[in-house]
């Protein structure tokens, strides 16, 4: 039986410091606030939103959810985003992705205010991530992956890390952050040939492909550390990851569960980024 890497101890440790930070800000008359912009009501978005709202409430961060219909026009969405950008009471903005087809993310990503873009949608923050510039905001989920590995004292330096998925939301940023920790990184995707033979080389496997229980036992190396980023919700509301947890837990050395794994840490990173944005906007360093 592998060592199950629960997210709660990691999230709680991060949150402890954030609670104290919020208290200091409130003494200065500043209340950090997060705005969530959600189009439609996808199950994985709602699950993440619920966790984010709960985490922010515990820490003392105000929140506002702006829900839009699935068929909202790009013009209307951009107008709402610009209003949110210009609201001085809002310090962080989270836009759930992927957006519906009528909303062009390649246009919208240039509209979000970089200083409020706490999940790395803006090309400015993406460039800072690539440069290793800590003044930006890396995506929350890949940062949660790194925090889990550090918390459980998993050595990254010199290890082979395989990232399954190449999105700008998780896959590519996770690879860059692992590279920053001096891991040797391979990115796999839908066109990778002999996929399982590549993933089996990883001392660390990060699954971020967005397919319910896609990663089976034959995908992983004996004793590997498996980090499951997936959130997949079925018709009955049951949540599963991208990894077949039951099938892989005996072979893996360490493995994160879904739920109660990466997601809970992601919300703490989100809160951390809201506070960072708030401090920067108020010139508190």
UniProtKB/Swiss-Prot annotation:
| Organism domain of life | Bacteria
Q: Which reaction does it catalyse?
A: (6R)-5,10-methylene-5,6,7,8-tetrahydrofolate + NADP(+) = (6R)-5,10-methenyltetrahydrofolate + NADPH; (6R)-5,10-methenyltetrahydrofolate + H2O = (6R)-10-formyltetrahydrofolate + H(+)
**Which EC numbers does the record give?**
1.5.1.5, 3.5.4.9
**Residues annotated as binding NADP(+):** 165-167, 190, 231
Q: List the disulfide bonds.
A: none
Pathways involved: One-carbon metabolism; tetrahydrofolate interconversion
Which GO molecular function annotations are given, in alphabetical order?
methenyltetrahydrofolate cyclohydrolase activity; methylenetetrahydrofolate dehydrogenase (NADP+) activity
- Cellular component terms (Gene Ontology): cytosol
Q: Which InterPro entries match?
A: Aminoacid_DH-like_N_sf, NAD(P)-bd_dom_sf, THF_DH/CycHdrlase, THF_DH/CycHdrlase_cat_dom, THF_DH/CycHdrlase_NAD-bd_dom
Alphabetized, the UniProt keywords read: Amino-acid biosynthesis, Histidine biosynthesis, Hydrolase, Methionine biosynthesis, Multifunctional enzyme, NADP, One-carbon metabolism, Oxidoreductase, Purine biosynthesis
User: Which GO BP annotation is one of this protein's?
Assistant: purine nucleotide biosynthetic process
Q: Name one Pfam family in it.
A: THF_DHG_CYH_C
Task: Give the matching Gene3D superfamilies.
Answer: Leucine Dehydrogenase, chain A, domain 1 (3.40.50.10860), NAD(P)-binding Rossmann-like Domain (3.40.50.720)
Question: What task does this protein carry out?
Answer: Catalyzes the oxidation of 5,10-methylenetetrahydrofolate to 5,10-methenyltetrahydrofolate and then the hydrolysis of 5,10-methenyltetrahydrofolate to 10-formyltetrahydrofolate.
Quote the subunit structure annotation.
Answer: Homodimer.
- Record-stated family: Belongs to the tetrahydrofolate dehydrogenase/cyclohydrolase family.
- Write down what this protein is called: Bifunctional protein FolD
Q: Which organism is it from?
A: Alkaliphilus oremlandii (strain OhILAs) (Clostridium oremlandii (strain OhILAs))
């Amino acid at each position: 039986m592998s060592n199950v890497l629960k997210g709660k101890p990691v999230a709680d440790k991060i949150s402890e410091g954030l609670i104290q930070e919020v208290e200091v800000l409130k003494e200065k008359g500043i209340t950090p606030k997060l705005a969530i912009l959600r189009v439609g009501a996808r199950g994985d978005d709602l699950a993440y939103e619920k966790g984010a709202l709960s985490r922010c409430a515990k820490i003392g961060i105000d929140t506002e959810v702006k829900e839009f219909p699935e068929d909202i026009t790009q013009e209307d969405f951009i107008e709402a985003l610009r209003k949110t950008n210009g609201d001085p009471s809002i310090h962080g903005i989270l836009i759930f992705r992927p957006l519906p087809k009528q909303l062009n993310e390649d246009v919208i990503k240039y509209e979000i205010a970089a200083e409020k873009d706490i999940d790395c949608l803006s090309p400015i923050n993406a460039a800072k991530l690539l440069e290793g510039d800590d003044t930006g905001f890396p995506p929350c989920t890949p940062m949660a992956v790194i925090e889990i590995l550090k918390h459980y004292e998993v050595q990254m330096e010199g290890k082979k890390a395989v990232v399954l998925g190449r999105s700008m939301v998780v896959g590519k940023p996770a690879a860059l952050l692992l590279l920053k920790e001096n891991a040797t990184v391979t990115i796999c995707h839908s066109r990778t040939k002999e996929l399982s033979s590549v993933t089996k080389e990883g001392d660390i496997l990060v699954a971020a492909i967005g397919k319910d229980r896609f990663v089976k036992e034959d995908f992983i190396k004996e004793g590997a550390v498996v980090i499951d980023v997936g959130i997949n919700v079925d018709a009955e509301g049951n949540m599963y990851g991208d990894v077949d947890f039951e099938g892989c837990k005996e072979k893996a050395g360490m493995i994160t569960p879904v739920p109660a794994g990466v997601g809970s840490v992601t919300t703490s990173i989100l809160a951390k980024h809201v506070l960072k944005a708030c401090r920067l906007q108020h010139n508190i360093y």
